Amino acid sequence: MAFAAPLLTLVALVVKLSSRGPVIYAQRRVGLDRRDGTRPTLGDRRGLDLGGRPFTIYKFRTMYAGAGRRSRQVWTRRNDRRITPVGRVLRAYHLDEIPQLVNVFKGDMNVVGPRPEQPEIFARLREQLDRFPERQRIRPGITGLAQVRCGYGGTPAEVERKLQHDLEYVSRRSFWLDMAVLLRTIPVVLTRRGAR
C-alpha cells in the first residue's frame, strides 16, 4: 500500500478539487459465500436473498455527489451523464479501483477473482442464470479472468459470457492463473479497454 500512497494522494486531491462530495465512494457488494449448507441464505438490510456475505467496497468517487440516489439506473453506460469529467479519466484507466486494496487487506476481496456485484444486480442475475451463485465460492477480485477477456458488458449475452469465464476461474484457480490474469490486466488498463 505504501508504494501506492503518492498516487492515492494525487487522485484523492484531484477528485476533491474537481467536484463537490466525498473523495471515496462506498457501496454494498456481495462477497464470499461462507455457508456450509446448514445455515439459511444471508440477506442484506433490504431483505434481498443473497448467496454471499455483503460487504462495503471502496472506490474513488467518479460520479457527481448523489447521482446514484437520484437515478434508478444501476449499471453505468457509455457517456453516462452521472460521471464527472475527472471520473471519466479515472474510470478509463481503472484508477477508481485503487481503494479496493483496502478491501483486499480487510479480507473482503482478493486481487484476482470474479467482480463483486451490487445486491440488486446479484439477485437479478441469480434469477436469470442458475450457476451465477457459484462465483461466490471464492472471494471477489479487483481484476479477473472475465474482466480481462470481456471487459465491461451489461447485455444478457455479455453477462452470460462473463459468467462462463468466472466459473472457469473458480474451477482452475491457481497461482499461475492469477499471474496470467495480472499480466493481462496491464494492457487492459493501459489501453483503457472495458472502461465506462
What do these predicted regions represent?
Residues 1-66, 175, 180-196:
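A hydrophobic, helix-centered structural microdomain
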Residues 12, 25, 84-88, 165:
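Positions in alpha-helical segments
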Residues 1, 76-139, 181-189:
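A short, structured surface patch at a secondary-structure boundary
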Residues 65-74:
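A short, polar/charged loop-to-alpha-helix boundary motif
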Residues 129-196:
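C-terminal terminal-structure detector
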Residues 13, 59, 82-85, 100, ...:
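Residue-level recognition of specific faces of alpha-helices
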Residues 73-82, 157-161:
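The feature captures the short pre-catalytic strand/loop hairpin that immediately precedes
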Residues 65, 116, 151-153:
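Solvent-exposed coil/turn segments that connect beta secondary-structure elements
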